[in-house]
Amino acid sequence: MGRGRVEMKRIENKINRQVTFSKRRAGLLKKAHEISILCDAEVSLIVFSHKGKLFEYSSESCMEKVLEHYERYSYAEKQLKVPDSHVNAQTNWSVEYSRLKAKIELLERNQRHYLGEDLESISIKELQNLEQQLDTSLKHIRSRKNQLMHESLNHLQRKEKEILEENSMLAKQIRERESILRTHQNQSEQQNRSHHVAPQPQPQLNPYMASSPFLNMGGMYQGEYPTAVRRNRLDLTLEPIYNCNLGYFAA
C-alpha cells in the first residue's frame, strides 16, 4: 500500500512531535545541502525548535556572510521604496530592531560555539565548519605571534648593536682622555724637574795641597783668611843655609 497523505495540523503527542521534528529537520537540511550542490546556490537555513534550540545550515563557511548579503539586498530594496507616512517610519524602526536583535543573538550563539559551549544542537557538517574556522583562526594567531616575536627580536638585536657601538665609542674617548692626561702629567713632571735642579758641587782640593805652604807660590788658598798670606809665602832668605855651612867649615 502506498503512503497516505499526512494531515497538516499540530501533533498533539509530544514524543511523536519530537520524533517528527527530528526526521523532518534532517530531511530539510539534506534538501538544502542538495540544492546548494546541484544548483550552485547560496543556501542558508535557520530552524528553531519548540524548546528554543537553534538548528542551522549554510552553504558558505560562515552564516554571517549569508546574513550580510541578505541585509545588503533587503536594505537596497527598502531604499527603492519611498516612505510616505509616519507609520512606515515606525515599521522601519521595528524591522531594524528585529534585525539587530537577531544578529546579536546569532553572534552570541557563535561565540558560545567558539568557546565549545552549546554544541548539542550542531550537526556534523556544522561542527566540521566550526573546526575549520577555529583551525584557520589558530593559524592566523600563531602567524601573528611569530611575526611579533620576530619583530621584537630584530628590535632587541638593533638595540644591542647600538649599545655596543656606543660603548666602543665611549671606551675610545676614555682612552684618548687618559692619553692626554698622561701627556700633561709627563710635561708637568719635566717642568718640575727643570725648576728644581740641584747646584753642581765645587771641586775640592787635596788636603795635602791645602796644608802645604810651599805649594802656594805667592798665592792664597781659597778658604784661608788674609792673615795666612804671610805664612804661606816662600821664605827665600839664605841665612839658615849660610849659618849651617859656616858651622861645617869651622869644625
UniProtKB/Swiss-Prot annotation:
CC annotations in GO: nucleus
Pfam families recorded: K-box, SRF-TF
InterPro entries noted in UniProt: MADS-box/MEF2_TF, MEF2-like_N, TF_Kbox, TF_MADSbox, TF_MADSbox_sf
GO biological process: cell differentiation; flower development; positive regulation of transcription by RNA polymerase II
Region described as Disordered: spans on this chain: 183-207
CDD domains the record matches: MADS_MEF2_like
UniProt keywords, alphabetically: Activator, Coiled coil, Developmental protein, Differentiation, DNA-binding, Flowering, Nucleus, Transcription, Transcription regulation
SUPFAM superfamilies reported in the protein's UniProt record: SRF-like
GO MF term list: DNA-binding transcription factor activity; protein dimerization activity; RNA polymerase II transcription regulatory region sequence-specific DNA binding
Name this polypeptide is given: Transcription factor CAULIFLOWER
